[in-house]
Amino acid sequence: MPIVRWLLLKSAVRGSSLIGKAHPCLRSIAAHPRYLSNVYSPPAGVSRSLRINVMWKQSKLTPPRFVKIMNRRPLFTETSHACAKCQKTSQLLNKTPNREILPDNVVPLHYDLTVEPDFKTFKFEGSVKIELKINNPAIDTVTLNTVDTDIHSAKIGDVTSSEIISEEEQQVTTFAFPKGTMSSFKGNAFLDIKFTGILNDNMAGFYRAKYEDKLTGETKYMATTQMEPTDARRAFPCFDEPNLKASFAITLVSDPSLTHLSNMDVKNEYVKDGKKVTLFNTTPKMSTYLVAFIVAELKYVESKNFRIPVRVYATPGNEKHGQFAADLTAKTLAFFEKTFGIQYPLPKMDNVAVHEFSAGAMENWGLVTYRVVDLLLDKDNSTLDRIQRVAEVVQHELAHQWFGNLVTMDWWEGLWLNEGFATWMSWYSCNEFQPEWKVWEQYVTDTLQHALSLDSLRSSHPIEVPVKKADEINQIFDAISYSKGASLLRMISKWLGEETFIKGVSQYLNKFKYGNAKTEDLWDALADASGKDVRSVMNIWTKKVGFPVISVSEDGNGKITFRQNRYLSTADVKPDEDKTIYPVFLALKTKNGVDSSVVLSERSKTIELEDPTFFKVNSEQSGIYITSYTDERWAKLGQQADLLSVEDRVGLVADVKTLSASGYTSTTNFLNLVSKWNNEKSFVVWDQIINSISSMKSTWLFEPKETQDALDNFTKQLISGMTHHLGWEFKSSDSFSTQRLKVTMFGAACAARDADVEKAALKMFTDYCSGNKEAIPALIKPIVFNTVARVGGAENYEKVYKIYLDPISNDEKLAALRSLGRFKEPKLLERTLGYLFDGTVLNQDIYIPMQGMRAHQEGVEALWNWVKKNWDELVKRLPPGLSMLGSVVTLGTSGFTSMQKIDEIKKFFATKSTKGFDQSLAQSLDTITSKAQWVNRDRDVVNKYLKENGYY
């Protein structure tokens, strides 16, 4: 839903005359010079005094007519010039510096909410009755959050609001009541509001999701919600802050044929005046961002393996693919109850597949919503990655039922307490249920590397990042809150011991259940459980940005010196950026085992090893840092793979590539190390090797073709032996590890243009399109589609496009869509880009073909040109206040590798508002800078290496 930013002072009235006396604060704010430039710009020659008079005349209202003041300033801030009558309201905001929060003269205790969507007008009628605790009866105003809401009436008891003042930019509405209203109540007060909202199509608040009925082919809509972080205010007037918890009793009204769902189970349901009315039981005390309700045609499957109903809902014809998630949900809830020693408190658990969904999933208490592909699973037609993805997403959202729902962060800088814990717990439970997946090994190449990649940018942020206002919150739902947060928890669990860690977490959850907590509360609980000073050690990691590189030097006689410095991918750390001393657990691995006692808590430290022939820092990659060795040590470690665990081998590959990219070591050290590991048996290590080579190839994307061909030749020589040994026949008797290894090697060989493998892939595709639907194993279907796209041609494009329109599974649909972006021909690229706005591709999926375009020069250029040309439409479809525009900006810009492109990108956005995605843009520019510096620095040395080793 586009956020309409009003710059003029306007009156929104339900009548004709504008007479009477306005609230004094209205006049004070409108007239104060601080607001004038943002509120009303008069024609040339109009005097300043006349401008004030015009605004004042426009703002005069007779109750109960309404005025909206919509400007770029808050109604009340620490320095607002409110009138004396309302000065106390202004002062209420001073209690929390650097945050724009609601006044606390009243706080919510309970909501009775009724909503009725209209699928013809795409609006909804609503009423909400909020029980308020009155903290300051001297103040006769109530301020709460609203967005795109048409308020019809508001009253407390029998007293109607005299004025309603909406501040669109701040997303608040203030209801003013006659003097003495609040003091007349002996107990709590009840605020009744009637309103109309927009059933928008922007995947925020209460919105409509379009889909094609699988059984009839009709276009239909479901009405669903996405409230996090601050979009409950789009669905109903509320106190939309995480620490303003309350209980909710929700009622839904619609056509009787539709299913009604909400957080709780049904209390009563009946038909009145031809409409179905469903009343749900009252929720526990919870935050507004967890409120959820759905009105749609739905069917379900269920699992009876838990003490309460566990269901997976989907639109008719899709529900059969929900059984995997239903069974996993039942098993996971039981596991988490046992792990935490706290019972899941709600009477049911519903999971719902939503057709248009901006995120992967949302942990609404008792009613978790998902993107379709992240919940429904056709195991016979899905990749291993998809199976694992569904499992991890489901378990992530179920972990939130405790982390986030039962205990909620006090404010958004504590988001990592929600997301970091849920990420760590999803890996923890996956490892319990599927040990053959080797998730803790995959963690190193997945979660940890994602965290380090983003945190190596100058534009990164601390785990606990200050958040002032609503439009800043979406930008911190990133790899820092999720992946670095989870990595920090893994580091703590290794330090304290897993059993002690879980014990402390359980104490934390029990102490703060149904309430809010801060990071320090977690540290204190872990300290109580372990007896260690957790707070002083871990506060540095959460409150400071970045991570260190540990440089290791040797004197040749057994003395090893470790030195820490802030790491940046651009390797240009300034002195004022290198002041933090991180507490680093060195976890030194030698032939005698692992010494976990060595902690680097100063700039440098020297120790002595009896036998320095073998050692590795950061055993199992449990620490959040990278290690830089001497060239000689890199060479030795490359030859000592048999002494290293899978995590250690993955860590070595990741570290040497990262250090090559930033210039801490030569890229030849990376190429030399991986070239010796052509007999590696672990799919996890191979994943990291291939990912690292792919990262290098993306940096060399705009280099001459012969250089790119030489890199492909290097890859072919490295992987061909293992690829051809394994083959590409997938058997049901193959273990998970064997299947994953086959997929990884087959994909790498196709990308490197191994002639035999490419030929096999193309034959599979030909046979598949000729009617043999078994010709392409589901596990490698995306690889085959990408290979076909790289070969190109209009005929192949038509075949892939047809698969996208009529897929046999959601997995296949997305694989085909992504591969459409891999076709290089200009006309085909133009055609793919055209689908993004003509309804062929859902808004939630427009980034998918963009991912394919980033694989080749032509796509990177075409995508950027399209972004520039269609910028206004992008902003309209993907409002900056939501999250997807930032993703599109990143995809549209970060594929470049030259400083010249940085100048061009900066010039384009210099005339645009970057509000809501400024951090994404800064990170993208940092990424381009890093790549440009890498290729400029090591171009010659890489060319020399490739030529000397016969790859040209």
UniProtKB/Swiss-Prot annotation:
The free-text note explaining how the cofactor binds reads: Binds 1 zinc ion per subunit.
Q: Which UniProt keywords apply?
A: Aminopeptidase, Cytoplasm, Glycoprotein, Hydrolase, Metal-binding, Metalloprotease, Mitochondrion, Periplasm, Protease, Transit peptide, Zinc
Q: Which E.C. number(s) belong to this protein?
A: 3.4.11.-
SUPFAM superfamilies hit by this protein: Leukotriene A4 hydrolase N-terminal domain, Metalloproteases ('zincins'), catalytic domain
Q: Where is the active site?
A: 397 (proton acceptor)
* Gene Ontology terms: cellular component: cell wall-bounded periplasmic space; cytoplasm; extracellular region; extracellular space; membrane; mitochondrion; nucleus
Q: Which InterPro entries match?
A: Aminopeptidase_N-like_N, Aminopeptidase_N-like_N_sf, ERAP1-like_C_dom, M1_APN-typ, Peptidase_M1, Peptidase_M1_aminopeptidases, Peptidase_M1_dom, Peptidase_M4/M1_CTD_sf
> Transit peptide boundaries, per UniProt?
1-52
Enzyme class, UniProt record, top EC level: hydrolase
Which coenzyme or cofactor does it need? Zn(2+)
Disulphide-bonded residues: none
Q: Name one Pfam family in it.
A: Peptidase_M1
Further details from the record: Present with 2910 molecules/cell in log phase SD medium.
Chain's role: Involved in the cellular supply of leucine from externally offered leucine-containing dipeptide substrates.
Instruction: Spell out the protein name for this chain.
Output: Aminopeptidase 2, mitochondrial
What is the native source organism of this protein?
Saccharomyces cerevisiae (strain ATCC 204508 / S288c) (Baker's yeast)
Higher taxonomy:
Eukaryota, Fungi, Dikarya, Ascomycota, Saccharomycotina
The gene for this chain is: APE2
